[in-house]
Amino acid sequence: MKKKMNKGICLLLAATMLTVGATGCGSGGSDMEEDKNLVSEDTDVAENARNSTDETSQDTENTDKEKDTEPQSSVSEAPDIEGLTFESEMSLTYAECFHVYYYNDGYKLLDVPESGSYLIVPEGKEAPEGLDENVKILQQPLKKIYLAATSAMALFDAIDEIGSIRFSGTQVNGWYIDSAVQAMENGDIIYAGKYSEPDYELLVDEGCDLAIESTMILHTPKVQEMIEMLDIPVFIDRSSYETHPLGRTEWIKAYGAMLNKEAEAETFFEDQAQIIEELKDFENTGKTVAIFYMNTNGVAVVRKPSDYMAKMVEIAGAKYAFSDVIDDSTGTTMDMTMEEFYSAAVDADYLIYNASIDNSVTSMDALLAKSDLFTDFKAIKEGNVWTTGKSLYQATDIVGQLIRDVNLMITDGDESEMTFLTRLQ
């Protein structure tokens, strides 16, 4: 099917596809409300929880923390592609959720387990005959991308490729990245509907060449199918599945491969890795930190011990309050009744309320209104409750700043130097 199809056919297909069946649910579960465009897809991930155990001494805690921050080189086996010769694999240090394989004549295979394989075809060349039908083709140059995965925008910006994005799944007032805001205000990037309700006609008329989605798209499989029927490949970003904060940042290399900006991506990543390397020497304070928000059902939603935000807390020199909690469900967050949350976090030294998910808590009174049980919490009694900024999940490129913030928080550092955290009054 050609992209420049008749508008009537496009609209008819869209109407047909979206009325065939009810919205589906994929493997990427989410605790986030679908209509909150200001929130990144970061809470919509599915990964196995890693169970943690108490360290017996401060020395042991520091040793384990250092081990957890050590880079783990990712190596895999390159797929055979008929007509192409494998040459090398991209070196990855922390990322575990994608691989890039290089073949002759500039061909690349971007493999994202559980999402798909994508053959990047150089400009002026064609995909080899006999290519596995499950391999999606990304034809360079990619200059009219529909970006529905908000966490990727900062990575595009870091390699100076916001110009490759033509369509946004977030409205201008939902962006906290200056370059994205400016591009939308200038008309260089246009709003094309959120991930679950894209403007198909606009994407076709403007010649969209790639849709980059978060795993939220798995909740609306008919939408993904419709986009692909319009001959627009769908790439699903799984950076939120990474268990190390730098694994998430290292996804800049995946986008660098798409846009032939590997060198720029490597340079940027190494700079960020150096920042984390310097931060990992923070002394373990023994302080405990809980990260959570309350959903509309009065349930506490917390980050699992395997989540990269829990890892940030450890690198910053604290212990994650839920490190001993075992949860076998999918997702990097887990639901806890208020009673369960009370049991696990009542004695936590610090509470961090995730305002990028729920921004209703703007004062201590607003938090106390969520449950009477909060009055017993140590952190609330001592005034050690903090909130994150709304921009947190879009800041994929500066993960070290949150680690610094947490360290400043637990060491009574200068609050004016914080980027994301604000003390709740």
What is the predicted function of each stretch?
Residues 25-153, 264-291, 414-425:
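Bacterial Sec-exported substrate-binding components of ABC uptake systems
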Residues 20-24:
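C-terminal motif of bacterial Sec signal peptides marking the signal peptidase cleavage site
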Residues 139, 193-198, 214-221, 242-249, ...:
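Soluble non-cytosolic domains of exported or imported proteins
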Residues 143, 150-161, 168-179, 219-222, ...:
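Extracytoplasmic ligand-binding site segments that recognize negatively charged/polar headgroups
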Residues 108-204, 210-217:
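A short, structured surface patch at a secondary-structure boundary
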Residues 275, 281-362:
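Flexible, glycine-rich surface segments
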